[in-house]
Amino acid sequence: MIERHLVDGLEVYDAKPEQPRSQTPLLFVHGAHAGAWTWVDHFLPWFAEQGYRAYALSLRSHGGSHQYELLHWQSIADYVDDVLHIIDWLGESPVLIGHSLGGFVVQKALERRHAKGAVLMCSAPPQGMLAGQFHLMFNNPAGLMDLNTLLENSQNDPHLLRDSLFAEPIDDDTLNRYLLRLQPESHRAIWDISIFHQAGLATLQRPPMLILGAEKDKILSPFLVQSTAHTYGLPCKIFRGMGHALTHEKSWPRVAETIRNWLEKEVDGSVVNAGA
């Protein structure tokens, strides 16, 4: 069962397990142009079935959260404040799971708060997106222009969406539902993640971390995911044949199962061992 809450104006979806297996909650953070709906379709109910209490928030000005009229004034720091506010509301340290821009927000949140773990899915690297934009510019300049057109909602083209975000087959109904829920992103936040607000590695908490990427990702290439992993001195897993939208690709269960297996080993296992 998934419930929807408004926590001081922030939309939060809450999936409760029928048979809890872990005391550590999961908090999912969406990427740019999206909302908590990114996780509600598949990941929240799936993880609840696995016994995890799973939450997803819509950052301010996204989804059903407040301040939509102030969208373009919102900063990465504002988004981090939202994540920390929901952690306080939970009353305990969660595992933070962020996709794309949400992964960058998770890294920034770890500068200010401890978490039981962190999962970065096709995440913007700690150095920000400037290098990624140059990489895309030189390797796929037409793709960069098409992607910018799509994500600014100036051309609602399902075929362009499929090419930009998906690598596996996706039916037209699912694609159109995804497209209709996309929204503009804060210009200020995009500037922040591009230039001004790199993750502070010296102050960043280092909980157990899982770094995931997609072989066919046209936004956050495997090279950038590998760069993030190198920065943290960790391995990464690149899912073959998948695109940027790991949450909605046909093979999304592969991603969910990888996260669950990691949780069992690195988070749940450490809790059990600590109490033994």
Residue ranges and their predicted role:
Residues 31-35, 100, 215:
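Active-site glycine-rich loops that stabilize anionic/oxyanionic intermediates
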Residues 32-44, 223:
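The serine-hydrolase catalytic nucleophile loop
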Residues 46-68:
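Conserved alpha/beta-hydrolase
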Residues 78-94:
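Conserved acidic catalytic loop of the alpha/beta-hydrolase fold
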Residues 115-149, 189-193:
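Flexible "cap/lid" loop of the alpha/beta hydrolase fold
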Residues 205, 211-213:
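Short beta-strand/loop motif that positions the catalytic acidic residue
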Residues 213-242:
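Conserved loop-alpha-helix segment in the C-terminal half of the alpha/beta-hydrolase fold
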Residues 237-276:
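Catalytic active-site module of serine/aspartate enzymes centered on a nucleophile-bearing elbow/loop
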